Amino acid sequence: MSVAGTAVRINWQPRPDKAKLGLVEDGFEFSASDIHAGFLDRETLHRILAAQSAQNIETIRRAAEKTLLERCGDTVRLRGLVEFSNRCVCDCNYCGIRRSNRAVKRYTLSLAEIVECAQWCAAKGYGSLVLQAGERRDEKFAAFVAEAVRAIKAETCSTELPEGLGITLCVGEQSEATYARWFEAGAHRYLLRMESFKPALFAALHPREQTYAARREALATLKRLGYQVGTGVMIGLPGQSLDDLVDDLLAFRDLGVDMIGMGPYIPHVQAPLGGADQIGSAQARLGLSLRMIAAARLLLKNVNIAATTALQALSETGREQGLRFGANVIMPQVTPVRVRSQYTLYDGKPCLDDNAEQCCECLRKRIESVGRRVLYQAWGDSAHFAQRRALAKA
């Protein structure tokens, strides 16, 4: 279907008997035999996202999976997820832990608790973890994160991981000095989601003091400092079009991101974002999210893409489907169960009551059920990052 190391183009074949002017899906179908070296243009990306027929969707899925296997291999990278604090200074309109939500019981794990979670991940061979929290920008928080990163590195060194666990941070917008401080402490990946690359949609999701320009600048700063940079968007937002999602995909490409974490929009009952009555069904948002994963894989080839927990919130097999459509990262929960229910960004979050051991075994079975295998005792860094670093040196 495609050749390793080359781009992919999907040609469309008209179906004259069903062709209707102005409708993207009707009148076209994918032909697996006609995928060849080339590039994915805006029109093709739009048609991938618009696809509805089972035949077209399966062809897209198979092409994305083939690209993944050729460019990244068949392993799934695990990132133990430690949601270490739900205290947040931001007031995002879609978020369950927003500053104004007085119904949330706030918590912050102790340093010892965070290190214990990290040691558990290392013992299970995860190789990496994600430290995620609500946004804070005070010195106490910056110092605490730096101390946690250093402690994790010191306490998780082994023969297999001589530098300790790989660490991804997901703690929002910070100053360049703070980003540099954490990088020097030992964090080497950073996930900062845009939620939408359309300025008007970004503004609808965030309060006025959070600006589109500041978040774009933060992503550029992270890349300049040497982080592996990740971002992502929500899919199926009120007022969001397929053209907006195509713009998101092209923004991933133009920014040269190394990692993508995106998933379906799921409302939270205590968040004020309007338009919940305008969003598609759970099935429709799940399907569109899977096609976004496939489109990102076909467009970007060798980045790391997460099969997010939100996929499983809409379908029991959501994360497995994400893997089959081109994802290669899963973030199993290791947050202590006693606080996990207080970190709900959206309603219906799964795995709130399963302990880390249960999540570990469950995900291993899920991964193996789709013919993939877990990558143990390795950071599982983005192949895209290695490629761009090699190019920079050259």
Protein language model annotation of sequence segments:
Residues 1-54, 122, 253-394:
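Auxiliary Fe-S-binding modules of radical SAM enzymes
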Residues 49, 79-82, 102-105, 129-142, ...:
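Glycine-rich, proline-tolerant flexible connector loops at the mouths of alpha/beta enzymes
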Residues 99-115, 121-219, 228-235, 258-261:
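Core AdoMet radical
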Residues 174-182, 238-252, 313-324:
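Catalytic cores of alpha/beta
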Residues 39-76:
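An N-cap/entry alpha-helix motif that binds or orients negatively charged groups
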Residues 64, 92, 131, 192, ...:
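Conserved, mostly hydrophobic/aromatic
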Residues 73-113:
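Canonical Radical SAM [4Fe-4S] cluster-binding loop centered on the CxxxCxxC motif
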Residues 129, 136-139, 164-170, 174, ...:
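Conserved strand-turn element in the central/C-terminal portion of the radical SAM core barrel
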